[in-house]
Amino acid sequence: MKYLKPINEFWGDVLKRDLLGETREEDRFHNKKELQEYLISEIEKQGENVVIRNLDVSLLEDLSGLFKDITIIKTLDISGWKTSNVNNMMSMFRGCKSLESLDLSGWDTSNVKNMRWVFCSCESLKSLDLSGWDTSNVVYIDWSFCDCENLKSLDLSDWDTSKVAEMQSMFWGCKSLESLDLSGWNLSKVRFMDHTFYFCKSLKSLDLSSWNTSNVKDMSYLFKDCANLESLDLSGWDTSNVKDMGMVDMFFGCPAPYTVVNNKIVKK
């Protein structure tokens, strides 16, 4: 793909075609390398505040590691991307340590299976909008928000987690996270949830009473160092498949009214 026009003129043409509902073959990215080269050139031009809207990546399935370890970016506007065929977002924004806000609302994630590490180590991130995401095919969400240490709120209440198998360390180190509504999540296929809330020290309450944990094998360190988590409802949890040591230090450093006795969760 060649961009011979000045960038403003090029995007003016793209916008006109968007308004007319037109898509030209030459406006599509045909492989990941082509996309990465274009993004790097734009980031070098634009610096810490990057705007790259309305890209057609509908031919691509793999966006893993796309912005990984790009530490210069503070704000990123990538709204309007056509992502209908993407199935892999692993580590897509991992290590974007300076990124402060990101709005991905409305992205088509209906075919995504892998979100492992997608926002991991975005340690400056304060605002993240994922509204409208279709997660019905996601299998891996482990480590997805780990070390997002400045994120205070996150709305994942409408996520479809019915196919998720691994969610360990999902919110590890989200030490500023104050509220989280996961009460409606279907976790019937989840096998690993160890370290999920490790060091979420600002969380004060969690209602997980409706979680189906019948297939979980490892819950170790699940609420470790959740120092302010006093209200926690785990009533009805099934730990029959949790292996030996799979619940080690589950509530260590957590004031929640539970403990583990003979590999079972019991009230203190």
Q: What function would you assign to each model-found segment?
A:
Residues 2-268:
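Negatively charged
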